[in-house]
Amino acid sequence: MADDKKKQLEESKRLVELFKASSLASKKPKGHEFWDTQPVPKIDDKIIESGPIENKTLDDVRKDPLTLPPAFEWIELDCNKPEELKEIYTLLYENYVEDDDNMFRFDYSPEFLKWALQPPGFLKEWHIGVRVVESKKLVGFISGIPATIRVEGKPITMVEINFLCVHKKLREKRLAPVLIKEVTRRVNLRNIWQAAYTAGVVLPKPVAICKYWHRSIKQQKLVEVGFSAIPPKMTMASMVKLYRINDEMKHPLRPLTKEDVPSFKVLLDDYLSKYKIAPEFTTDEDVWHWFETRKDVITCYVKVDESTKKVTDAFSFYNLPSTIIGNAKHNTLKAAFSFYNVATTMSITDLVGDALVTAKKMDYDVFNCLDVFENSTFFKDLKFAVGDGDLQYYLYNYSTPTKKSSEIGLVLL
């Protein structure tokens, strides 16, 4: 073990030395220096109309990859190769999103990453890594997937950008902007000029600022790991009683089947048309990819009208556990994240209540939800508590007036 730690320390020092010798480390950016060069609105811009910020053609796009220092190289990662999928997993597991107190770190499973990175029409060239030439160690990653996103009623071909991750020892070395520029270049070469992304930090300029809400399922565990606390004048026993979830669903919902997809797509399309920013699932294949129940990845239940055989209601949530850092008793927090929910024959409160029952049966610790869609209407009745984290939504090379969180109909993983 001591030898392993020594090797890791030496490798980390070596990474920093390699970057110190490179041009990328020559100047530390200040403020939003990088974003001020990009086609995004400035923080204090007052936006009245929607539309592209700059119009380019393929002739304007650099044909060769951006230059990296000699010690580093670009790579396209193939999620169908287990060893390359494991490299992405390891980089994210060791270096990706942690909470502000460094108590929890997202743990995206390899199966989840395959689902997130390989929808219909995905391109391997948009799964971009940076390796150390000598050791072949993956030290940076960014991904894009194709999407059609409707903004103010207008469908736009975009990419969803996700999983931007740089090795901890190379933070502040200006590698993230290079990754962003390179994925932008490759996307532009496909004649796509807009993107959607989210971040826990404020950059120029959020199109919406959304809040996370949390519903406790296993109260005792959540207190033991520091995720929540016992409220004043309550005991653990009274807290457990207060947050008890029913054992059985109120309504006859079952997992989505392939036969349900055409009518489920109609239901989903109609529901999403109400929102100012929302995806368009263009084919049945898209819908089946994103909503087919996959163990430890995504769960989708539907209610079907027995006479018409049409889907009338649906809930879905995805599985995103977190590693618990430095807790002697627990090492994983099993969290369900609300995805897309549509209620037409029952209240949205009853529908999500049944989702909570399902999550409880599946042994989740907590159910997380953004205040997008109409979600804020059920938070009080279902005993959700507001979290301390915000999630900012952004559009690249597209400006549109700032939206309320309830006007957003899009969930990015």
From Swiss-Prot:
InterPro entries: Acyl_CoA_acyltransferase, NMT, NMT_C, NMT_CS, NMT_N. It is found in: Cytoplasm. The keyword Membrane does not apply. One of its GO terms (molecular function) is glycylpeptide N-tetradecanoyltransferase activity. Its EC number is 2.3.1.97. Belongs to the NMT family. This is Glycylpeptide N-tetradecanoyltransferase.
